[in-house]
Amino acid sequence: MLLGQKSQRYKAEEGLQAQGEAPGLMDVQIPTAEEQKAASSSSTLIMGTLEEVTDSGSPSPPQSPEGASSSLTVTDSTLWSQSDEGSSSNEEEGPSTSPDPAHLESLFREALDEKVAELVRFLLRKYQIKEPVTKAEMLESVIKNYKNHFPDIFSKASECMQVIFGIDVKEVDPAGHSYILVTCLGLSYDGLLGDDQSTPKTGLLIIVLGMILMEGSRAPEEAIWEALSVMGLYDGREHSVYWKLRKLLTQEWVQENYLEYRQAPGSDPVRYEFLWGPRALAETSYVKVLEHVVRVNARVRISYPSLHEEALGEEKGV
């Protein structure tokens, strides 16, 4: 799991009880086995919608569906329920000169997954320039010949935005199908005003806030770095999206009052720990963050930074 095992969840509950928020924890909904199974397919799609970001921040142009296999890795055929019967019947028949239905289905799924990736990049660009977006715009600029599949494409792109970037896609005009993009959980921070303005950092901030809760509302520094390393984020290693991660955690988010970074009381040798800062406490709640963490754990069991890199990989081609 991204944020630890059951023992860590118990520690979080224990810590929250001490702070008077224990009743709220009981409201956190843990996904059922069926929901987790469906989420597994969703996480595979999220991984498939993303491509790498160059160190210079200059994304490459989009690929055609035929050439998308290098950036679109879809291993679960249930993602797009197309031609299942045709695939099985073809296997029963002998060699044929007609196109392989399974191969055609795979190409079709890859094309749809690429549309999800394109829509994520389109929505990120809209968020960066603070513009609303309409269904008509998405159909014309991104979906094009896949209009019949818009509901599925839009749903999966919205999930990527929420789970990975910490951005909610909210409908504000049902009649006109108009949407706005806002940061999740009431947080007012997105990180676009810092050194790296290419991508919102709200998603990672929420994850770190969740890690702190999992450690009982105060997290030893080494526990945070260990959890981040599981996600492919390492102390002392610069990253194309987060640049200097230590600076982000111990300086930027501390200056923004989302985190406290202090010497652990009574530690010898000296050790440091992270706590929620006053701005995090004012803007969101333990329960909201834990609910978000549960959704992330259910949906994204893969390398976290690769999601950001791949989603931004072809942003210039939007």
From Swiss-Prot:
Tissue distribution of the protein: Expressed in many tumors of several types, such as melanoma, head and neck squamous cell carcinoma, lung carcinoma and breast carcinoma, but not in normal tissues except for testis and placenta.
PROSITE patterns associated with the record: MAGE
Superkingdom per UniProt: Eukaryota
SMART domains noted in UniProt: MAGE, MAGE_N
UniProt keywords, alphabetically: Tumor antigen
Boundaries of every MAGE domain copy: 112-311
Region of interest: Disordered: 1-103
Pfam families attached to this UniProt entry: MAGE (PF01454), MAGE_N (PF12440)
InterPro entries assigned: MAGE, MAGE_N, MAGE_WH1, MAGE_WH2, MHD_dom
Signal peptide start and end residues: none
One GO term describing the cellular component: nucleus
Example of a GO biological process term: negative regulation of transcription by RNA polymerase II
One MF annotation (Gene Ontology) recorded for this entry: histone deacetylase binding
Functional description taken from the UniProt entry: Not known, though may play a role in embryonal development and tumor transformation or aspects of tumor progression.
Protein name: Melanoma-associated antigen 8
Gene: MAGEA8
